[in-house]
């Protein structure tokens, strides 16, 4: 089913997957991440952090956008209606698309992601899919996030990468993000994991107690 939402599925509906210019403003990328933060009740990173990422990795830090051209989507839906295909549903979608043009203009970014491409000199080339966000209030049934990963995978193959790393998964595979990643039938590498070795037990105890409290306070402030 996931494969259905790749390639021609998005192209025919007016969605293109573009790479942002390295000098582009990051506010739109951060806005889309913010939509995911609110939806999932998590806290990611601010704009300053991503500026540092760009500075550190240069043109290897690639930001992708799933960009919807609503006029092309309108043409696509009008074509289906003219062929008498699922008229009630496509008429509803057409009305929705026209309303979006009135509200947001012809071009809308549905989702975004940040991928770090590997050093060309590296022996093992791994593209790292680090962050992603999407605005599910706009045409969520088009599954733009799937297309973003597909675009990143295609570019990583063209760059001669050995792997496209989607990041870690929860041990139970029951969390939302793990369920999304599993759709791509990944090869899962199991490592020992992470551990903490306190060098100052008093400071570490304070860190263990205060950090959860700080996170809760930040969530309350954002709400």
Set out the residue ranges of the language-model regions:
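Secondary-structure transition/hinge residues
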Residues: 37, 41, 156-160, 189
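A conserved beta-strand-loop-helix scaffold within acyl/acetyltransferase catalytic domains
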Residues: 1-139
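Acyl-donor binding region in acyl/amide transferases
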Residues: 105-110, 122-186
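Active-site/acyl-donor-binding loops of N-acyltransferases
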Residues: 159-223
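Short C-terminal domain-edge/linker segments immediately following a structured domain
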Residues: 13-19, 48-52, 149, 159-162, ...
């Amino acid at each position: 089913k996931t494969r259905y939402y790749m390639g021609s599925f998005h192209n025919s509906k007016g969605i293109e997957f573009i790479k942002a210019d390295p000098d582009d403003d990051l506010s739109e990328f951060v806005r889309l991440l913010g939509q995911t933060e609110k939806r999932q009740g998590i806290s990611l990173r601010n704009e300053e952090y991503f500026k540092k990422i760009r500075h550190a990795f240069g043109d290897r830090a690639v930001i992708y956008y799933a960009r919807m051209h609503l006029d092309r989507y309108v043409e696509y839906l009008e074509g289906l209606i003219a062929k008498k295909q699922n008229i009630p549903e496509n008429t509803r979608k057409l009305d929705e698309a026209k309303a979006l043009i009135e509200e947001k203009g012809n071009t809308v970014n549905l989702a975004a992601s940040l991928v770090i491409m590997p050093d060309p000199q590296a022996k093992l080339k791994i593209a790292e899919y680090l962050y992603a966000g999407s605005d599910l209030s706009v045409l969520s049934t088009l599954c733009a996030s799937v297309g973003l990963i597909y675009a990143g995978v295609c570019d990583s193959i063209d760059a001669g990468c050995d792997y496209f790393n989607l990041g870690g998964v929860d041990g139970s595979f029951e969390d939302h993000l793990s369920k999304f990643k599993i759709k791509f039938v990944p090869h899962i590498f199991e490592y020992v994991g992470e551990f903490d070795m306190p060098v100052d037990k008093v400071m570490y105890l304070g860190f263990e107690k205060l950090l959860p409290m700080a996170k809760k306070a930040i969530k309350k402030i954002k709400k």
